[in-house]
């Protein structure tokens, strides 16, 4: 067993897999595991695995022990991650409450919502708080200027600020794409499916407050789009892959329940609305507590529009009658069929196959849980990029260390890098330098005076 295979097995174990770890422990280089986990922003999650090993494999650890100095360093970092999570949770709850009190519906994207799916929500390395606000760009900018300290920069999809020392991004919309056709389709999809996301309220751990987070049905599309965007920007890391693994596992449980009589299609609408999952499945490929903390509550004053109940364009094509809709819900595969159609419509189908390959190779996702067939060729490329670049591409050594260069040099190195991807993803790769150039001049034009 080589190092990287052992690392992948250890990640699965840290997420709750019950496979035998004796052979993995025997060949594990603990210092290399620490370096890998640090590069991929997974130190907290991996330390959870080490603590579990101490309880389940004490004799094996005696034969290949973790050095005391390394263990203490790792433990200290994990405690720091826990404290960071507690602070970010508190600020996320405060920010959500403040926005709602000021009459702005919103939801927290990725981040602390994703952490709730982990076996230990405090083990995920936190980042900034991304909050999607249900208002026009003008209203959000006017509000932000009154409530926050802003820099002079503005981006197409968000404003950057901070609250109580925690970086915050106020989103006009969740994500963008480089290709203008797919970007327009994506924004239409966001608008059609927005309403339920702002009313899907969950509780943060230890009384930190309540926030709205997107539904699993929304996340399975949105977070894949986020991965796709960052793949062409500076790269993605294993932390984002694990986030998406948990989303896919949660989605599988949701659509398996889609034949439940309590789940129905609204009359006069083609949109299917699954209930948020509430309990673990016990499957070895997903932690049993995957969805346990997602305690849905009443989401405030807005009512859920029939056209915004979780997926856009959900009907089986050519048949929207109420009678046929009931027949559609009798199949547990309906939601998967719909999502696959959305992936193709939004230009995500090939990338979805690559991600499924990575989830299978690294985390053992079984074929029956996949949202698309594995694409081995594109998947191997994606996995190589993840392993080389680390968290958001911060550790790239190829492409001229492009993430560590100045703006001018990085501009051309990014183009050079993305030309490597043209034969795999031509629409997005060829559009990337055009979009980035346009975005630069757009930012200059809209820069705060």
Question: What is each model feature region?
Answer:
Residues 1-127, 132-257, 333-449:
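Conserved NTP-donor binding/palm subdomain of two-metal-ion nucleotidyltransferases/polymerases, i.e.
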Residues 257-334:
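Intrinsic disorder/low-complexity segments
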């Amino acid at each position: 067993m080589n190092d990287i295979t052992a690392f992948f097995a250890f990640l699965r174990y840290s997420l709750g897999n019950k496979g035998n770890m004796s052979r993995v422990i025997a060949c594990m280089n603990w210092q290399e595991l620490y370096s890998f986990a640090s590069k991929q922003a997974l130190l907290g999650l991996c330390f959870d695995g080490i603590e579990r090993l101490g309880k389940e494999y004490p004799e094996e650890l005696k034969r290949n022990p973790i050095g005391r100095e390394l263990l203490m360093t790792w433990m200290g970092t994990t405690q720091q991650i826990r404290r960071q999570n507690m602070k970010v949770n508190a600020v996320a709850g405060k920010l959500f409450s403040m926005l709602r009190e000021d009459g702005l519906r919103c939801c927290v994207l990725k981040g602390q919502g994703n952490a709730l799916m982990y076996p230990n929500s405090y083990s995920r390395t936190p980042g900034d708080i991304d909050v999607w606000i249900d208002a026009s760009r003008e209203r959000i900018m006017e509000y932000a200027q009154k409530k926050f300290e802003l820099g002079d920069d503005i981006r197409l999809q968000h404003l950057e600020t901070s609250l109580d020392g925690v970086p915050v991004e106020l989103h006009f919309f969740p994500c963008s794409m480089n290709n203008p056709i797919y970007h327009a389709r994506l924004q239409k999809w966001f608008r059609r499916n927005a309403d339920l996301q702002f009313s899907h309220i969950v509780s943060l751990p230890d009384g930190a407050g309540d926030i709205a987070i997107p539904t699993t049905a929304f996340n399975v599309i949105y977070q894949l789009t986020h991965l796709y965007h960052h793949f062409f920007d500076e790269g993605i890391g294993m932390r984002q892959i694990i986030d998406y693994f948990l989303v896919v596992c949660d989605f599988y449980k949701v659509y398996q329940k889609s034949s439940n009589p309590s789940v129905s299609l609204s009359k006069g609408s083609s949109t299917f609305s699954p209930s948020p999952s509430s309990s673990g499945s016990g499957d070895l490929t997903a932690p049993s507590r995957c969805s346990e903390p997602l305690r849905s509550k009443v989401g405030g004053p807005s009512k859920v529009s029939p056209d915004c109940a979780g997926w856009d364009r959900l009907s089986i094509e050519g048949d929207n009658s109420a009678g046929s809709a009931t027949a559609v819900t009798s199949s547990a595969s309906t939601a998967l069929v719909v999502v696959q159609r959305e992936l193709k419509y939004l230009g995500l189908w090939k990338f979805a196959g690559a991600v499924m390959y990575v989830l299978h190779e690294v985390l053992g996702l079984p074929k029956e849980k996949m949202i698309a067939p594995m694409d081995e060729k594109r998947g191997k490329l994606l996995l190589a990029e993840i392993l080389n670049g680390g968290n958001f591409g911060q550790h790239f050594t190829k492409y001229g260390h492009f993430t560590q260069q100045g703006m001018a040099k990085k501009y051309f190195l990014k183009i050079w890098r993305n030309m490597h991807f043209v034969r795999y993803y031509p629409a997005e790769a060829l559009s990337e330098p055009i979009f980035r150039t346009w975005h630069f001049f757009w930012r200059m034009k809209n820069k705060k005076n």
